[in-house]
Amino acid sequence: PVIAMVSYSNFGSDNQGSPLRVHEAIKILHEQYPEIIIDGEMQMNFALNNKLRDKSYPFNKLKGREVNTIVFPNLSSANSAYKMMLEMGVAESIGPIQMGLNKPIHFTDIASSTRDIVNLTTVAVLDAIVQERRNKQ
């Protein structure tokens, strides 16, 4: 994956509140997991437009790549963008995916289609396989 962490600021232009938390998370990820292709914080237009991002912020670690994974700063902004994309018909839903819990858990939306449920079931099965392998180690 090529991951962008989005915010309302770009690469430290606002150094307080949620942009600062995103910026600090990126710093930790770059230090501890340098193999992960991730950068931010950045506004959505810079995340989605690699030419604009590369021209404006040539130091970015996503240079020349198209983002295929977006991490939002909070549930409210993530859910709003997710619902907007679904209503506009520009994305297929896979999720929501809960992470960081001791056991896999997944929720379906009241408006989920059969395809949405099949996709989420696939994620749940993969979660179970990964967890089983971890438990055997």
Language model: regions and residue ranges:
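Active-site rim loops that border cofactor/substrate pockets in soluble metabolic enzymes
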Residues: 8-69
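Flexible, glycine/charged-enriched surface loops at secondary-structure junctions
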Residues: 1-4, 33-42, 131-137
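Internal helix-turn-beta structural module
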Residues: 60-62, 77, 82-137
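Short glycine-rich anion-binding loops that position phosphate/pyrophosphate groups of nucleotides
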Residues: 11, 75-78
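Catalytic cores of large soluble enzymes that bind and process phosphate-bearing ligands
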Residues: 14-21, 73, 109-116
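Short, well-ordered beta-strand segments
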Residues: 4-6, 106
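Short coil/turn connectors at secondary-structure junctions
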Residues: 1, 33-35, 65-68, 93-94, ...
